[in-house]
């Protein structure tokens, strides 16, 4: 017969084996969940707290989007995410007015490695919406409108811009919804030194090229885009004297504000993740 010491050793060994098996099973389950969640094309953002045992209730617009736009059917899978968790759900039933989702699994949304703030002058509605949409897809963390000397679009529908940002994140498989702040003055932006560096886009082709700069994703970066008609001479002087501020060129061509924002964001994201 086994002694008490041998029994204790065997029990301890069994506990270690169970712990190792449970750990690997948990990791495998996470990998499988991540793979399936990435493959699910139907994605909906719900701006409220959801518990894993809750019933997810969608509003009329979201149901219409799932059924009529994405053509979601019974037994299809839908990714539902809020600001904290990502849920893999299965459609139990869907009609024009109702949608019943069963929660299959969930995971915590990890914070993004980068932090990029886009400072921009509000422009006309259509190009502004394009800028918000594309920069949300690419990865802007915070949109900060700035009232500049040549700003000619001061009335902005921020609720619509937030909706556009949400839809862009749903489409692009991004789980972090960017913030869209209320406008600040140019002077307030100049006096802000909370970020590691500020890159203002200049029409001077002799300025620094972003691709030649040393940028890392663990540093908070600000991109400053001028209004239609560019920064004024006085604003250029303020930008040049601003702490941690560097002028950058986006090439020899004169880009529209929304094009400059999208281009600068793309170059910086590629630089910090792929360089």
Predicted regions and their residues:
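N-terminal positively charged helical leader segments and presequences
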Residues: 3-5, 20-108
């Amino acid at each position: 017969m086994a002694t008490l010491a041998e029994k204790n050793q065997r029990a301890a060994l069994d506990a270690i084996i169970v712990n190792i098996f449970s750990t690997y099973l948990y990791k495998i389950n996470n990998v499988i969940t991540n793979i399936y969640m990435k493959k699910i094309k139907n994605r909906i953002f719900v701006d409220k707290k959801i518990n894993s045992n809750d019933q997810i209730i969608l509003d009329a617009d979201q149901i219409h989007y799932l059924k009529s736009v994405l053509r979601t059917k019974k037994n299809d899978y839908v990714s539902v995410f809020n600001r904290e968790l990502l849920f893999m759900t299965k459609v139990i039933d869907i009609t024009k007015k109702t949608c019943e989702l069963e929660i299959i699994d969930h995971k915590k949304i990890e914070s993004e490695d980068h932090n990029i703030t886009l400072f921009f002058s509000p422009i006309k509605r259509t190009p502004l919406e394009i800028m918000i949409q594309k920069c949300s897809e690419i990865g802007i963390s915070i949109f900060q409108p700035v009232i500049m000397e040549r700003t000619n679009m001061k009335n902005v529908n921020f609720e619509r811009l937030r909706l556009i940002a949400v839809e862009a994140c749903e489409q692009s498989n991004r789980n972090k919804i960017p913030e869209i702040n209320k406008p600040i003055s140019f002077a307030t932006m100049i006096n802000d030194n909370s970020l590691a560096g500020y890159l203002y886009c200049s029409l001077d082709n002799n300025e620094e090229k972003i691709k030649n700069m040393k940028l890392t994703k663990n540093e908070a970066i600000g991109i400053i885009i001028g209004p239609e008609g560019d920064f004024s001479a006085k604003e250029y002087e303020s930008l040049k004297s601003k702490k941690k501020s560097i002028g950058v060129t986006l090439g020899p061509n004169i880009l529209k504000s929304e094009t400059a924002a999208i281009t600068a964001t793309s170059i910086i994201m590629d630089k910090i993740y792929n360089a």
